[in-house]
């Protein structure tokens, strides 16, 4: 008789208890995906440079209009807390003090992909669509392309657009246009 192997799924609360107990460290590069603790890829220079460019661009142009969050957790549901490379949140004067980040407050989620493109296109895209994130970007550092996903419906994004380094993309919710040559350098 075959016995099915069961995995223990961790909730977001379990995940934080593991950190408080010292089993995982707040400095560990991990995230909670489908109840599993997933080790993230190490930083590399092209990835870091692109994140820094995006951060500078958004922070300088969107002060008072949006909150720029760099590599901090985003609680999507009870079993998923990824750590996107960058999130733009609706502006609030209190910066959501005392609250976990929630998908309904996010305007844009960005993953910068240098070595994780398949994962970002698959698992992450599905998670963000199911959570109702209005706009998701995958910044493909290697090929200097931006994949833009919008209109989350029934667990998937209805619209996909591929943009090149010479293109611009408008964030309609913020009335702001990003020149991709500034992102890719």
Give the positions of each predicted feature.
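Gly/Pro/Ser/Thr-rich low-complexity, intrinsically disordered segments predominantly at protein N-termini
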Residues: 1-185
